Amino acid sequence: MSKGILGKKLGMTGLFSSDGRHIPVTVIEAGPCVVTQIKTKDKDGYNALQLGFGPKKERHTNKPETGHFEKSGGAAYVMVKEFAVDNPEEFELGQSLSTELFAVGEKIDVAGVSKGRGFAGVMKRHGFGGGRMTHGGRCKRRPGSIGCSAWPSKVIKGKKLPGHYGVERKTVRNLEIVDIRADQNLILLKGAVPGAKSGMLELKKLKFGGK
């Protein structure tokens, strides 16, 4: 069995549990993902499946990509990722994988690219408290001192300062699957996942045991 699949974030909504609790959920289009390459320990040194998801326009596909995808049916994909697998011999090129890898109540890890927020200050980027909001104050949203002048006479590497915020790979662990709608290739996860609407995601089996 593959350790994960690819998906797309469609947005957030809410569900009510049997006891009347409101549960915020993220709706994810999980597959169908196509097996574009099978890697084995004998040939490649490790066992893995290369999965493709999301159709890619022909005019955006170069010749090496076209030749690679011809082996699995010819269609090109926007997102291509590898997932570890224990038994690669059970899969074949062009095979489709979807929500059947997961079950309701199971907890999974979700990885994606966070929303881009441009150039941000220290309060938004790092959660600084800021200065006193007094009349005439000049340090309301400033970071304060960033180092000493006499020694070491420089800003220490790694100092939290204003800068570009977002567009980073983030992983959220132990998200519970609330519902699976196999006929629509949808998975409803409890809570939020990284990225904006239509962002590509990796849905993976737990790397660490969840409670």
UniProtKB/Swiss-Prot annotation:
One of its GO terms (molecular function) is structural constituent of ribosome. GO terms for cellular component: cytosolic large ribosomal subunit. Pfam families: Ribosomal_L3. Keywords: Ribonucleoprotein, Ribosomal protein, RNA-binding, rRNA-binding. SUPFAM superfamilies: Translation proteins. It comes from the Bacteria. GO terms for biological process: translation. NCBIfam families: L3_bact (TIGR03625). One of the primary rRNA binding proteins, it binds directly near the 3'-end of the 23S rRNA, where it nucleates assembly of the 50S subunit. Belongs to the universal ribosomal protein uL3 family. PANTHER family: 50S RIBOSOMAL PROTEIN L3 (PTHR11229), LARGE RIBOSOMAL SUBUNIT PROTEIN UL3C (PTHR11229:SF16). Part of the 50S ribosomal subunit. Forms a cluster with proteins L14 and L19. This is Large ribosomal subunit protein uL3.
